[in-house]
Swiss-Prot record:
Keyword Transcription regulation listed: yes
Entry-linked InterPro entries: MCT-1/Tma20, Pre-PUA, PUA, PUA-like_sf, Uncharacterised_CHP00451
Domain of life: Eukaryota
Official protein name in the record: Malignant T-cell-amplified sequence 2
Compartments in which it is found: Cytoplasm
Xref: SMART domains: PUA
Chief site of localization: cytoplasm
Keywords of the record: Cytoplasm, Transcription, Transcription regulation
Family: Belongs to the MCTS1 family.
The keyword Transcription appears for this protein: yes
Gene behind the chain: Mcts2
Amino acid sequence: MFKKFDEKESVSNCIQLKTSVIKGIKSQLTEQFPGIEPWLNQIMPKKDPVKIVRCHEHMEILTVNGELLFFRQRKGPFYPTLRLLHKYPFILPHQQVDKGAIKFVLSGANIMCPGLTSPGAKLYTAAVDTIVAVMAEGKEHALCVGVMKMAAADIEKINKGIGIENIHYLNDGLWHMKTYK
């Protein structure tokens, strides 16, 4: 999604949000990520300006004080950025890939089923279309944010094809866009 994303070329405009819109976004975030509720006022303080950065391909990035927090495409679900996920790793369920998959994930490839079922990988129960943080064997922080394309039980049974779609990974265009003022 952000493989060829460039801040100078991809950003079209930036809009400061009204309080009523911010409340709606906060309720959508608590509905989507139940574990985030106690931390939401710390992530998005009431007095700080909340802006939406609009980008090409109908991408919207939610920022607070210039810090990129969440993004979404069209009016779809919000995804946390990796920078936010590294601060609050508990907001998403985790899946773990083995060491052999790391270089492919960091180049933007989707996570294949064998990378989730081999020794060193850990596959936790998750339904289809669940937003997950993809961790790596022996690493502390998430490599990417992805969406389950198969249920965990199906990944173990079938063990072929794409298991998790890679949405945002370390060193992609969004990762390099550190802040937006």
